[in-house]
Regions:
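Sec-dependent bacterial lipoprotein signal peptides
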Residues: 1-19
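Bacterial lipoprotein signal-peptidase II cleavage site
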Residues: 18-32, 38
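Short, well-ordered beta-strand elements
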Residues: 36-48, 66-72, 139-140
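Beta->alpha turn/N-cap motifs
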Residues: 48, 75-76, 86-100
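Short helix-initiation/N-cap motifs at beta->coil->alpha
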Residues: 71-81, 168-188
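Alpha-to-beta junction loops
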Residues: 84-94, 138, 161, 182-185
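Ligand-binding "clamshell"
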Residues: 101-113, 127-128
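A conserved helix-loop-strand patch within extracytoplasmic ligand-binding domains
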Residues: 113-162
């Protein structure tokens, strides 16, 4: 099953990546410029799993005349900034709500060329083994961007840790918390 999932994701990445390259004509056997030089596609990605997926599909792209140049970023702001500045041809790391939020906040007009998987969220701790063990007043780290913060708060609500207002959606913030029985502190 893991191999099948990997192949599916690789195909998805390949499709999304090539969609940004334009359409080939029937006369073109590989992706090359007018002089026959292979096309270089510079893509920004976060390390896991996006960079790994791109490395997986890079040999297949090379067979089609596309040299994939991967630029790794360790935060979620720089890939979009680099793309908007023309330093990249594409990036691969975000879901559509994050892209829309980034465009709105930064006055950019970046567009999606294809859907990708959405990273799962979970609760992690080196000390606490279950939600019930969370101490009163404990600090819980949450993402610092609007869309992923909302996803994290919805996850916390689903585990009974907090209650959000009925109007809270994917862009929920700490202000949308209407019940916090154990007085948790949230740190973006």
């Amino acid at each position: 099953m893991k191999k099948l999932t990997t192949l599916f994701l690789a195909g998805l990445v390949l499709t999304a990546t090539l969609a940004g390259c334009g359409q080939k004509t029937d006369q073109e056997a590989t992706a090359t410029d007018a002089g026959g030089t292979p096309v270089v596609l510079k893509v920004g990605a976060t390390p896991i799993p996006h960079e790994e997926l791109l490395k997986f599909v890079a040999p297949k792209l090379e067979e089609q005349g596309v040299k994939l140049e991967i630029v790794t970023f360790t935060d979620y702001v720089q890939p979009n900034a680099a793309l908007a500045d023309g330093q990249l041809d594409a990036n691969f790391f975000q879901h559509l709500p994050y892209l829309e939020s980034y465009n709105e906040s930064n006055g950019t007009k970046l567009v999606s060329v294809g859907n990708i998987h959405v990273e799962p969220l979970a609760l992690y701790s080196k000390k606490v083994k279950s939600v019930e063990e969370l101490a009163d007043g404990a600090t819980i780290a949450i993402p610092n961007d609007p869309t992923n913060c909302g996803r994290a708060l919805i996850l916390l609500q689903s585990k009974g840790i907090i209650k959000l207002s009925d109007q809270a959606g994917l862009e929920a913030t700490e202000k949308d918390i209407v019940e916090n029985a154990k007085n948790f502190t949230f740190k973006p």
